[in-house]
Amino acid sequence: MKKQTLIALAIVTSFCFGFALNSILFRGKEETSKTKKVTGIGGIFFKCKDPKKMREWYQNHLGFNTNQYGSVFEWRQGSDSTKKGFTQWSPFSETTKYFEPSTKDFMINYRVENLENLFKQLKNEGVTILDSIENYDYGKFAHIMDIEGNKIELWEPNDAAYEKLGIQLGSKTIK
């Protein structure tokens, strides 16, 4: 009886020790793989010859509500349908330097969660980092390059502040 009890105790102790060791060694790695990196499209930016005419064309033919920055699409977040989300659409002058060092005529902005952690992770993975994180009332921004030389803007949005800024600028969203 004592032998069976000792064997059972050894098995339970080994299991607990192994579980504890596994938790210590792999803490955060499971969280990283479960971390949702991109949550949606934050913006679509492209170069054109005449941004003003381009905005007018989209307004006249496709019903966009445009201002000097382009247009904003308003939608509801899937994880919480009471929260608004926004996607910016903006034509830029063909001479803009904003997309550099990319030579492409477009840039996509991705909405992300926890930009600081994502940025550290991307650095560790060897992704080309173009700048440091910039903070604004309406969110945090950083830029990276993908493997084909496309500049990517990462945005951790503060949608409430973004909406407030839009109202101050007189923007009307597309719903």
Q: Where are the predicted features?
A:
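A short, acidic/glycine-rich surface segment
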Residues: 92-98, 162-163
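Hydrophobic membrane-insertion alpha-helices, especially the h-region
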Residues: 10-18
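Vicinal oxygen chelate
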Residues: 17, 22-49, 68-69, 96-175
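Positively charged n-region of N-terminal signal peptides that target proteins for export
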Residues: 1-4
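Core segments of cupin and vicinal oxygen chelate
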Residues: 35-39, 45-90
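Residue-level signal for short segments within beta-strands and strand-turn junctions
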Residues: 77, 93, 156-158
